[in-house]
Every structure is written in structure tokens, then in C-alpha cells.
């Protein structure tokens, strides 16, 4: 397939994956699947724009998760996020917070070697997302 995301075979494969996910999730017309690869700063901008409605809470315990938290913190259209951090080798925990519509955490931080078992936040506002 080549190594560049600009190669026709790669673009074709990504298109098939997006179409398949759209079909799997029965997405309405006009909805799109966004894919990003590791280190894709543009993906964090897309996620900040399209997944967080107003306020987010983050578990930040490595490079991957901290980038999303920083991106949301810099987004002028969003409220100030709550960011929970921890000592190296450990992971913080979410706390239910009124007005938070998105809770975001990595499952596995390769930069620190910490992995968690994601779970919905007890007593979170109705409709809050867990990413």
C-alpha cells in the first residue's frame, strides 16, 4: 500500500473503512466518520469542535491525553475544562461535575505505560459523553 496517507490505495482503504463504519452505525445523511492516526493534532481540533458541547473533564496522565485537554482548553468557543492529572505511573479518576458534557480519557498511555479500564462517571449529567 505504500507508506504515505496520500497514496491512492491508502485513500481507498480509508474510504472503505469510513463507509463501513457509517453503515454499521446507521449514520443519518450528512454525518461523517472522522479517522485520525496517532499524533494527529488536527484530529484533536476536530474532536474539540465536534464532540465537546460546552465543558469537558479530562484525565491527563501522559502525552496522548494531555494534547486533547490542551486543545479543548485553547478552544475559544468552549468553557474552561477540568483537567485531573496524576504522578507518573498512576492515573487520576473522574469526579462528577455539574455542567460537564464530555468526560475524556485515554485507555492506554504509551508514554507512561499506564492503562485504565474506562467506566461511565457515576452521577454525571444526563447525556454526558465518555470518550
Model-derived regions, located:
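Conserved N-terminal alpha-helix of the aminotransferase class I/II PLP-enzyme fold
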Residues: 1-46, 50, 63, 70-71
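Short glycine/serine/threonine-biased micro-segments
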Residues: 37, 60, 111
